[in-house]
């Protein structure tokens, strides 16, 4: 049996780490024990090097297009070398971010050309996409306050609030048009967020059960 690919998306401070735990817990309840966890950017030796370049200040300014191209280079390394092989082996993959992050952060936040974004996505990924995307929706000011509480912010997390409002707006546009995506209110208590995630995964499982 071919595995499934579930992705968790959201702004900084939305609670993706605890959401991952909730998803894995539900999958175990449903009898899915062989689960692979991935993160973007990262997940392979080359992708992790690109992650460092993307998230940290460098000697020269990183242009918006260069940032996007590095993200896609890291993404395709992960997809081809980790995600697809795992799925073909019947394993389930739970990802911390995937392509929707680029569409929201670089397409919405950075305001890169939509045609350029779409062309790059189709060229690199083709029709590969998650089976389920869980988007954790949170007001940027709330999420950033949580992120700051964790310590030092990376290069992207240091962007101004308007950047994250644009990113959130684009996320909401993307999930509205995506039948394979669900929205979770991430401003609730962690218990309610976990309950909503578990319910969403179980409902998705029932609707896709063969």
Curated annotation (Swiss-Prot):
Keyword Signal: no
Catalytic activity: dTMP + ATP = dTDP + ADP
Stored CDD domains: TMPK
Entry EC number(s): 2.7.4.9
GO cellular component: cytoplasm; cytosol
InterPro entries: P-loop_NTPase, Thymidylate_kin-like_dom, Thymidylate_kin_CS, Thymidylate_kinase
Alphabetical UniProt keywords: ATP-binding, Kinase, Nucleotide biosynthesis, Nucleotide-binding, Transferase
A biological process from GO: dTDP biosynthetic process
Pfam families tied to this protein: Thymidylate_kin (PF02223)
Single GO molecular function: dTMP kinase activity
Keyword Transport among record annotations: no
Binding site residues for ATP: 10-17
NCBIfam families to which the protein is assigned, alphabetical: DTMP_kinase (TIGR00041)
Family: Belongs to the thymidylate kinase family.
HAMAP family, sorted: Thymidylate_kinase
Protein's name in the database: Thymidylate kinase
Gene name of this polypeptide: tmk
